[in-house]
C-alpha cells in the first residue's frame, strides 16, 4: 500500500509531454540539499539538523549525522562532506570526525546557503543578508564567498546578493539564484538567476530587478543585471543544469500558494514552468542515470524526472 501511495505522488505532478516522474526516495524531514557520496548513495540534509542517506526506492532514510545547525548546503569532495550551516561550514568524515572549516559568518534573517566546488579547486558559498533591505555592517553578508578546502584564503567573490541560495558551476561559469527583497509590494521585485564573475556587484539593497520592466530599477550604477527574471516572491532556490538548460525550483511562500511551488526551465533566457504539483520544491541535482532529482521540502519526497522512453 505504501508503494502505491508514493507512486500516486509522482503521478500528481504535471510535466511536459515526453517526460515523466518517479519517486526516488521518501520519508525525509524537510530536505534542503543533496550530494552523491563516494559510496554511490545520495546524501540529503534536513533542516531539522540531520544528514541522511538514501538510494533509489528508499522509504526509510539512514541517518548519517545529527546535531547540525540548519544545514542548507552539502558537498562531497573526495571522502569529506562539507556542510553549510548557520554561520559556518563544517567538514564531516564517515568515521565520525567533525571539523570547523569556516566560522563566525554573519546570519540572521538569512544564513549560509549552497556550497559548491569550483574548477579552480576552491569552494564557493552563498552567504545571505541579515535583513530584508538594510546597510550591512559585515562585508561578508549578502555575498558569494570562496575559500580553500581547509578554510584558508576566504575571499568575497561577488556582493549585493540579498540571499544567493543556489550555486552551480557549468564548466567555468558560476550561476546563482537570488531571493529578492520583500518590501516592494506583491509584484516586485523579480527573483533572479545571475551569472557571477569575480568582483560583480548585484545591487542589493539600493538596486533591484524589476519584474514588470525586466530591467534594473533603483540606484544601479555599476550593477550587473540578472540573466533571468523569475516570479516575484516565489523563492528561487535550487539550480541545476540538465539537458542543455538551467532549471530552478521556486519554493513559494509558506502560508500562500499564490507564488512559486514549481520547477522552471530557463532556455535561451526565457523562463517557463516545467513542472508543477509540488508542495515546496527546494533542492536540485542530477544523478548518474541522467535523471533530474527534485527534493520537495514540503512533502519529504525526492522525485526523479526523466525523458520518457
Residue ranges and their predicted role:
Residues 14-15, 112, 129-134, 139-152, ...:
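Beta-propeller domain segments
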Residues 23-28, 63-67, 101-107, 156-160, ...:
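Surface loop/turn motifs at the tips and blade-to-blade linkers of beta-strand repeat domains
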Residues 25, 32-35, 75, 116, ...:
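Conserved beta-strand position repeated across blades of beta-propeller domains
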Residues 51-78:
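Blade-loop segments of beta-propeller domains
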Amino acid at each position: 500500500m505504501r508503494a502505491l501511495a508514493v507512486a500516486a505522488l509522482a503521478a500528481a505532478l504535471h510535466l511536459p509531454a515526453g517526460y515523466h516522474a518517479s519517486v526516488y526516495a521518501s520519508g525525509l524531514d524537510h530536505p534542503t540539499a543533496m550530494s552523491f557520496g563516494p559510496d554511490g548513495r545520495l546524501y540529503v540534509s534536513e533542516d531539522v539538523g540531520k544528514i541522511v542517506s538514501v538510494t533509489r526506492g528508499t522509504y526509510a532514510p539512514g541517518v548519517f549525522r545529527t546535531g547540525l545547525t540548519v544545514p542548507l548546503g552539502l558537498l562531497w569532495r573526495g571522502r569529506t562532506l562539507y556542510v553549510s550551516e548557520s554561520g559556518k561550514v563544517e567538514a564531516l568524515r564517515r568515521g565520525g570526525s567533525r571539523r570547523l572549516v569556516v566560522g563566525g559568518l554573519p546570519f540572521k534573517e538569512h544564513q549560509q546557503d549552497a556550497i559548491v566546488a569550483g574548477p579552480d579547486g576552491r569552494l564557493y558559498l552563498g552567504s545571505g543578508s541579515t535583513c530584508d533591505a538594510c546597510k550591512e555592517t559585515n562585508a561578508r553578508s549578502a555575498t558569494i564567498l570562496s575559500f580553500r578546502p581547509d578554510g584558508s584564503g576566504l575571499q568575497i567573490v561577488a556582493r549585493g546578493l540579498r540571499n544567493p541560495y543556489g550555486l552551480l558551476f557549468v564548466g567555468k561559469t558560476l550561476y546563482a539564484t537570488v531571493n529578492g527583497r520583500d518590501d516592494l509590494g506583491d509584484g516586485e521585485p523579480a527573483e533572479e538567476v545571475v551569472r557571477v564573475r569575480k568582483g560583480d556587484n548585484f545591487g542589493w539593497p539600493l538596486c533591484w530587478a524589476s519584474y514588470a520592466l525586466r530591467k534594473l530599477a533603483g540606484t544601479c550604477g555599476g550593477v550587473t543585471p540578472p540573466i533571468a527574471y523569475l516570479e516575484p516572491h516565489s523563492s528561487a532556490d535550487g539550480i541545476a543544469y540538465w539537458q542543455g538548460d538551467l532549471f530552478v525550483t521556486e519554493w513559494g511562500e509558506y502560508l500562500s500558494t499564490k507564488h512559486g511551488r514549481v520547477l522552471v526551465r530557463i532556455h535561451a533566457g526565457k523562463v517557463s514552468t516545467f513542472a508543477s504539483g509540488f508542495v515546496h520544491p527546494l533542492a536540485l541535482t542530477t544523478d548518474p542515470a541522467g535523471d533530474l532529482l527534485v527534493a520537495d521540502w514540503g512533502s519529504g519526497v525526492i522525485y526523479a524526472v526523466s525523458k520518457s522512453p
